[in-house]
Design a protein with these regions (language model features):
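Soluble "head" domains of membrane/secretory-pathway proteins
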Residues: 2-9, 24, 28-199
Length: 199
């Protein structure tokens, strides 16, 4: 059987174009992330699937880290996806402090610029503006932080399961430009099936 150019143009080319557009959109606009561990409990659990807004911190040329349009700067309390500075593995952690802020942590409890973030209304949680982080301190608080000044353009990212998270307390600060996107919502949770839980 012989295939003509007309057949290729009508049948194959549209499918190839659609595949290229879908993969480019996943690279630059939105994607999903599978949570591999419990380092973000009690906010995210192992097996959760999360929608990631890749335009939150800027619109990039597909498959690169080159910004076409600059986006918002990350804010404390946001949950972000980025590569680990230690080994390049894709991670999801909470941004707890950004450039110009000073972070301290004792027994898993965070203070930023001298203000403790522990929620009075919801014990075991921390308040980041309107965002509430439900912590897991069952394994202790992990390493402490003493007066860490965050330089401009950098940020501190830490897991909500403070005693069971390999995070910025181990590998240090990350550059804002290294963020792939902001986690928006959990869309699938083991045991519950499809859900929509905003982060």
């Amino acid at each position: 059987m012989r295939f003509s150019r007309t057949w290729f143009r009508k049948e194959v080319a549209p499918v190839l174009l659609a595949l290229v557009l879908v993969t480019a959109a996943r690279s630059s606009l939105a994607d999903h992330y599978y949570v591999p561990s419990g380092s973000m409990e009690n906010t995210l659990f192992a097996g959760d699937r999360v929608v990631v807004d890749k335009t939150a911190y800027g619109l990039r040329i597909p498959y690169t880290k080159i910004d076409m349009i600059e986006g918002a700067h990350p804010k404390p309390g946001e949950v972000a996806v980025f590569d680990s500075p230690a080994d390049g593995v894709l991670l999801i952690k909470r941004i707890v402090a950004v450039g110009g802020q000073v972070a301290t942590m004792a027994e898993g409890h965070l203070a930023v610029d001298g203000v403790a973030l522990e929620s009075r209304l919801f014990p075991g949680s921390e308040q980041f503006g309107e965002r509430l982080a439900a912590l897991n301190l069952a394994d202790g608080g992990g390493p402490s932080i003493e007066h860490l000044v965050i330089p401009a353009g950098k940020l501190l990212a830490i897991g909500d399961h403070r005693g069971n998270s390999l995070d910025g307390r181990y590998w240090g600060l990350i550059d804002e430009r290294e963020l792939y996107g902001r986690a928006v919502a959990v869309y699938f949770r083991k045991g519950d099936g499809f859900v929509w839980k905003r982060l």
